[in-house]
Amino acid sequence: MYQAVAFLAMIVGTHTVSLRIQEGCSHLPSCCPSKEQEPPEEWLKWSSASVSPPEPLSHTHHAESCRASKDGPLNSRAISPWSYELDRDLNRVPQDLYHARCLCPHCVSLQTGSHMDPLGNSVPLYHNQTVFYRRPCHGEEGTHRRYCLERRLYRVSLACVCVRPRVMA
């Protein structure tokens, strides 16, 4: 269980970044350093931990990609296999987030590991990740590189899960 939690935390983009954020810094322009202070180097160079997801697979639903492997990473052994797509934004912390993309419209049969089972649908599982966007501070004149951090929730697909289809009455 702990391995799955650690794996999902890694994919969500849990990065350790040291930023000097003033208390109550979620609104513009209170985030900006005073004129005597230089902007922290971290604000100018956003760094994020290097996360290497498994190799992305094909972007279409092919029968070959709709197989559950017997070994390998979690995303390829699942009955709702998925691949990862990189979402990079240089003005966001973390800069790199990986989204899961379901490889099959239906779930892979547990009996065969290769045939799709139309009784289950493969759907993404989402999480709202807290991210920070770097924005120029309002009211600052000149060519100073001063930035404010704007906190937002960002929807990230973590994995794909097998669910029963919804029945419309």
Curated annotation (Swiss-Prot):
Residues 47-70 are annotated as: Disordered. Residues 1-16 form the signal peptide. Transmembrane segments: none annotated. One of its GO terms (biological process) is eosinophil differentiation. It holds the Pfam family IL17. GO terms for cellular component: extracellular space. Residues 61-70 have a biased composition (Basic and acidic residues). Disruption phenotype: Mice display mitigated inflammatory responses and Th2 responses in house dust mite/HDM-induced asthma model. Its main location: secreted. It is found in: Secreted. Cytokine produced by various cells such as eosinophils, T-helper type 2 (Th2) cells or epithelial cells that plays a role in internal safety of adaptive immune responses by regulating cytokine production. Promotes and augments T-helper type 2 responses locally or systemically. Exerts its activity via its receptor composed of IL17RA and IL17RB for signal transduction. In turn, stimulates the JAK2-STAT5A pathway and promotes the secretion of type-2 associated cytokines including IL4, IL9 and IL13. This is Interleukin-25. It comes from Mus musculus (Mouse). The gene is Il25.
